[in-house]
Amino acid sequence: MAKSHTLNPEEEFEEESGLRPSLLSEFIGQKEVLNNLTVYVQAAKNRKRALDHVLISGPPGLGKTTLAGIISNELGTRLTITSAPVITKGADLARLLTSMGENEILFIDEIHTLPKKLEEILYPAMENYMIDLVIGEGVTAQMVQIPLKPFTLVGATTRSGLISEPLKSRFGIQLRLDYYNDEEMKQIVLRSSKILGVLIEDDAALEIGKRSRKTPRIANHLLKRIRDFSEVEGNLSVKKNLCLKAFEKMGIDDLGLDGMDRQILDCMIDRYKGGPVGLKAIAVVVGEEEKTIEDTYESFMVRIGLINRTPAGRVATEKAYRQLKRMEDFSVHHGQDPTLF
């Protein structure tokens, strides 16, 4: 796979590529997505035509960029990676589209942030492999159609609800990635440890997986930090006891909550008696952006039952109080007898 990093200065794909699976057969988890994608890719190969445009949605770190790379590898074609926030002008998008070779893949991350005027450039490009450009200004301006080579747009989003219906409907293939289970996370840690040359016991890999918020990207980051602790202590292999000590030092609990998670929950409990409370109020208190809280922290805590989203705002659940060992506060806030807890 040849990669082009147009308009992507951070090159995050390269930084993590060593641990990313490169083929569908190497990808762990997301069975339904993989089974369907295998069929779609094979059909495109058999027809020797561009794969239908693909929209991949789901929380951060679950493998959206990785799947774009896998599609490119499986089809044996070039992948160009960019992100919607850095495409600010129609000329940027036109340059990307006209640079695409036949059946090549254009990956646009955070596609839900693409401005409407740029979306409208994509419509004919996705449907008819054409773009309409205005040449000149004023009364002399002319609309010129520029043909494109057949290509596949792979869009990734953490907020599929923010994508306009006209754009969403042009993706013939729509895939949703979900959080991984503990066994899948363990297998991901074992695979990554082999690539990194880290000897690790199964129960240690499971412990890392359980504290990785059901997210492979976080699992890989934690594995590297556990490796640091293990090497400094002079251990030949990573054991569960070392993981437990390292996680305690890093402030990561048995559910994978870190300091910011606890700060968010403490804010809800201490200032708002558990809620309901608005996202903006939480963001002001903890000093973090609303989008970051919603995408990175809150979505996971909602998933595991620590926060409920209600029409009136966010509410900390009984499980959240229990996890923070604050059941006396729960009884006070909910008018119950503290001795019950």
Swiss-Prot record:
Its main location: cytoplasm. Its EC number is 3.6.4.-. ATP binds at residues 19-20, 61, 64-66, 170, 180, 217. It is found in: Cytoplasm. Disulfide bonds: none annotated. It catalyses: ATP + H2O = ADP + phosphate + H(+). The keyword ATP-binding applies. SUPFAM superfamilies: P-loop containing nucleoside triphosphate hydrolases, Winged helix' DNA-binding domain. Mg(2+) binds at residue 65. It holds the Pfam family AAA_lid_4. The keyword DNA damage applies. One of its GO terms (cellular component) is cytoplasm. DNA binds at residues 309, 314. Residues 1-180 are annotated as: Large ATPase domain (RuvB-L). It comes from the Bacteria. GO terms for molecular function: ATP binding; ATP hydrolysis activity; four-way junction DNA binding; four-way junction helicase activity. Homohexamer. Forms an RuvA(8)-RuvB(12)-Holliday junction (HJ) complex. HJ DNA is sandwiched between 2 RuvA tetramers; dsDNA enters through RuvA and exits via RuvB. An RuvB hexamer assembles on each DNA strand where it exits the tetramer. Each RuvB hexamer is contacted by two RuvA subunits (via domain III) on 2 adjacent RuvB subunits; this complex drives branch migration. In the full resolvosome a probable DNA-RuvA(4)-RuvB(12)-RuvC(2) complex forms which resolves the HJ. Belongs to the RuvB family. The RuvA-RuvB-RuvC complex processes Holliday junction (HJ) DNA during genetic recombination and DNA repair, while the RuvA-RuvB complex plays an important role in the rescue of blocked DNA replication forks via replication fork reversal (RFR). RuvA specifically binds to HJ cruciform DNA, conferring on it an open structure. The RuvB hexamer acts as an ATP-dependent pump, pulling dsDNA into and through the RuvAB complex. RuvB forms 2 homohexamers on either side of HJ DNA bound by 1 or 2 RuvA tetramers; 4 subunits per hexamer contact DNA at a time. This is Holliday junction branch migration complex subunit RuvB. It comes from Leptospira interrogans serogroup Icterohaemorrhagiae serovar Lai (strain 56601). The gene is ruvB.
